[in-house]
Amino acid sequence: HLRWYEDRLRHLQGLAEDVAEEVEFFVFSDHGMSDVHGAIDLIPEVERDFGPNGKRYLAFYDSTMARFWSDDASLLDELRDALGQRHEGRCIHEDEKADLGIAFDDRTQGDLHFVVNEGLLIVPSYMGRSMLAGMHGYHPDAVDADACLLGNFSPSLDPTHIRHIYDLMDATAGRLVEERA
């Protein structure tokens, strides 16, 4: 698959070079991919211990993360304790959410977040019923979570977060416009 992308990117770069004196070309990803080697069947275990989804709590089961909402703080504590006993993942603590950029002022993203370890999936989940060979969306500290930035030039900015890609594109485009004016 990489050869297919390389061929098309080189073709695109060639088209740009046909119409411009200077082309600064870069490609970026927003995350890496991890090989999947196992799955956990989390939904029936949570429902066995805490009742059906939608009664005392609301849960959304993504392939790598489970999010929980409840107005019952003691239930959230019980969920956190139960999930904290699992070796296949961990709960994201409140103080860590700011570092990850997920400390939202509202509850739209959940009250409690459980993320599975790299290489595992929650199967079934609301994202699918079967295990896949690769996945993203693990904790940013995961070995294969890093994104990449490839280009034919040295960037003026060193992006360390996906939010910085826009700043890099804006600075590069602005500099090229100024140089050509």
Question: Which stretches of residues belong to each language-model region?
Answer:
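A long, amphipathic alpha-helix that forms part
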Residues: 1-25, 172
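Acidic/histidine-rich catalytic neighborhood
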Residues: 18, 22-25, 29-71
